[in-house]
Swiss-Prot record:
InterPro entries: Arg_succ_lyase_C (IPR029419), Argininosuccinate_lyase (IPR009049), Fumarase/histidase_N (IPR024083), Fumarate_lyase_CS (IPR020557), Fumarate_lyase_fam (IPR000362), Fumarate_lyase_N (IPR022761), L-Aspartase-like (IPR008948). The gene is argH. It is found in: Cytoplasm. It catalyses: 2-(N(omega)-L-arginino)succinate = fumarate + L-arginine. Its EC number is 4.3.2.1. Belongs to the lyase 1 family. Argininosuccinate lyase subfamily. This is Argininosuccinate lyase. Pathway: Amino-acid biosynthesis; L-arginine biosynthesis; L-arginine from L-ornithine and carbamoyl phosphate: step 3/3.
Amino acid sequence: MALWGGRFTQAADQRFKQFNDSLRFDYRLAEQDIVGSVAWSKALVTVGVLTAEEQAQLEEALNVLLEDVRARPQQILESDAEDIHSWVEGKLIDKVGQLGKKLHTGRSRNDQVATDLKLWCKDTVSELLTANRQLQSVLVETAQNNQDAVMPGYTHLQRAQPVTFAHWCLAYVEMLARDESRLQDALKRLDVSPLGCGALAGTAYEIDREQLAGWLGFASATRNSLDSVSDRDHVLELLSAAAIGMVHLSRFAEDLIFFNTGEAGFVELSDRVTSGSSLMPQKKNPDALELIRGKCGRVQGALTGMMMTLKGLPLAYNKDMQEDKEGLFDALDTWLDCLHMAALVLDGIQVKRPRCQEAAQQGYANATELADYLVAKGVPFREAHHIVGEAVVEAIRQGKPLEDLPLDELQKFSPVIGEDVYPILSLQSCLDKRAAKGGVSPQQVAQAIAFAQARLG
C-alpha cells in the first residue's frame, strides 16, 4: 500500500506506478533505511510519541528485519512497494501491527531518503578509500621491484627522456593520493545529518537533532531544513571525484595497453586479466585494461547527467531528485570495480627490462643531456638547443645514437665538446642528473617510495 493514498480517489495507473516506483534501485538503501528508523524511534521516545517499551519492540523488529535483509536482499525486489521506505514500513507493520504505523510520526520521506543516501555514501566512501589505498600500495610495491628498469619517458607519445618503470608507477601513486584526498574532503561535507528536517520546514517535534545525528554516526546535524532535503552536493562531489579518479585509471590503462603492445613490448600481462580471440589463436588481449578505459565514459556521463538534473530545480524537494541514485550507484560501483581490477593487473605484470632499456637507448632521449653539457661549458641554452638539434639530424642521417658519433664529428657542431661528453650521454647519467625533488634519479625515486610507504603505513 502507498504511504500517501488518503488524498486520492482513483488508483494510480499501472504504467505510472512502474514509471514512478524506485524500489528496483533504491532497495540498495535498505540497511541505511532500517538503521535510520531505529535512530528515529529513539528520538520519538524523547518527545513522548513512543514509550520506551514501544521503542524497544520497534527496534527489535527492525533489527530482525535488518538481519533478514542482509541474509536475503533479493526478497526486496519481489515486492511491488513504491520505494524502500514503503517496503521497510510495510514489513515493520507486518511484524508489530499498529505500532509500526507510529514510526513515521514527524518524519518525511524527504529527510528520510536524504539521510539514507548520505549513510550509503559514507559506507561507500570507506570502501573506495580502502580500494584506493590498496592500489597505491600495489603500485609502490611494483615501483620498489622495478627501480632499475629503465624505459623511455614520452611526450606527444614520442620518446623524450629516460625514466624508470618505478618512476612511472609513482606518478600514478600521486594521482591516486589526490583522489584519496578528494574523497576524504567530500566526506567532511557529507557528514551532516538531515534527519529531523521533515518535508522542508523542519519537524514539529522538539527533537534534539544533534543527538540524533550522533546516534547515526554523523559529525553534526544540518542547519537549514530547506537546504537539507534538497541538497545533493555530496552526490555531485562524489561523482566528480569518481570522474577524476576514473580519468586517472583510464590513463593508467592506456599506458599499460601501449606498453603491452608488440611494438613496445615493455610489459607482459598475466593470463588472469587477458582474453583470447574466437578466430585468431595467437591473440592475448588486454581486456581488463580496455574495460577500465571504456568504463571511464559512463562515469563522466553520470556526473554530467546529475549536473543537468539539479541545475533548474527550485527549493525544496522535487521528484527529479529520485534520479540521483542510479547514476551514483553505477558510477561508484564502476570506480570501485576498476580500482580492484587495476590492482589485479599489476599483481601479475612482468616488466621486460632488456626491452625497456633497448627502447630507452633509442630515439635520442639523451639529447637534453648534451644540451646541458654545452650549457655547463658556457654555451647559452638556446644556442645549445640548436647545436644539439643539428647533431641529432646528423646522427639520424648516419643511423647512429648520439653517443656513437666520433668526437671529431661532434666537434663540428661545437668546439667545446670534449671526451668527457661520452659518460654524460649514458642512460645512467641521464637518470642520475635528475636529482632535484620529484626527479627520476635513483635517490629521488627511493625517497619517493619510502615516503609513500610511510604514508600508506
